[in-house]
Amino acid sequence: MSSALDDPTLERNFKGHRDAITSLDFSPSGKQIASGSVDASVMVWNMKPQSRAYRFTGHKDAVTCVQFSPSAHLLASSSRDKTVRLWVPSVKGESVLFRAHTGSVRSVCFSADGQSLLTASDDQSIKLWSVHRQKIICTLREHNNWVRCARFSPDGQLMVSVSDDRTVKLWDASSRQLIHTFCEPGGYSSYVDFHPSSTCIATASSDNTVRVWDIRTHTLLQHYQVHSAAVNALSFHPSGNHLLTASSDSTLKILDLLEGRLLYTLHGHQGSASCVSFSRSGDQFASAGSDQQVMVWRTNFDSVDYSRVLQQKRDHRTPSAQASGAAGDPESRSGQKTEVSPLLGVSAERSVREPTPQQQTDADGVPAALTSTLQHIIGQLDVLTQTVAILEQRLTLTEDKLKECLEQQHQALTEH
């Protein structure tokens, strides 16, 4: 019987950096991968065979983060030299310089519409920028230590930040007001990202753990202790059902969020694994670290289970910034500690705020508030249907495996 889960496979690797790689990002089309390095350079790797890579130099110190804009017309990079650069990802490598902070800039993140840029810095601040005007919109100063990472939610309504002050802060992107502060019980988080549904966040921590938080109820949903050293980065699969992590223990881990278990451990890097990223389609992912090479993997394990569900989500939702997959050895729960709550409702859409204080009506005379509510209910029903479909697939797979085991047992007894 063929399994619905196939192991991830290493497709290719790229070498060209002269020091540890700190950050990765796929272009929206999946045709390019950008990487930043301690060697102060940004490189853009073309996935087409025999295509040359672009090397961009301009930063005066280590590059800490890179990200493509949603249109792929720009590539942002941050650096320890306290600046941010916006590059045109072509052979010329032209860039615009932002003198952003008074300390090292740790991360950059484009908003879903590509109009804004979010930066986090060792100067303990988060800054929101207008990409077009190249001006600061506002500065947020609620952290009291280095801010390691700040991200926009896929739906554009929220922002999240993590700091060495051992807090995770959730912000309203429109009002720029602090909504909630999560306190980390162990070490500090060096990386944070939103679930594709914008309902949860995951943090990568210095205490070797990964935590998944529900931002609606402000509760800890899942807690994974699967690494033996600090977790440096993570990336959600676009389906929202798997989470990829990179650690200083040199391994990559793939977590099944629906079942709350470790699915694969990937070995390949020599030394610390510092960054991971799924492609927007989810069929590939990339990893990199102190061994100065970018590894590109074919996801495989997710293609049978969730490709149809992912397509359904695209048909019903506005596409959001997403990522790709991994490879390795199947893992069971034994020997690994996890604290898990079900994520079956994790894809539920966030409720939409009413746009104006006045009742609005559409062309058919139906109140806008009622239309919005009905659309939200329909969205919730779609998510429920997709979740049930996934559970049915898993149940069928389990039944098939059980049947095969019973047949093998019966055959063994017959032979003896």
From Swiss-Prot:
Protein origin, superkingdom: Eukaryota
Region (Disordered): 311-340
Keywords: Cilium biogenesis/degradation, Coiled coil, Repeat, WD repeat
Any one of the GO BP annotations: cilium assembly
Record GO cellular component, one term: ciliary basal body
Entries under Gene3D superfamilies matching the protein: YVTN repeat-like/Quinoprotein amine dehydrogenase
Protein family (similarity comment): Belongs to the WD repeat POC1 family.
Protein name: POC1 centriolar protein homolog A
Species the sequence originates in: Danio rerio
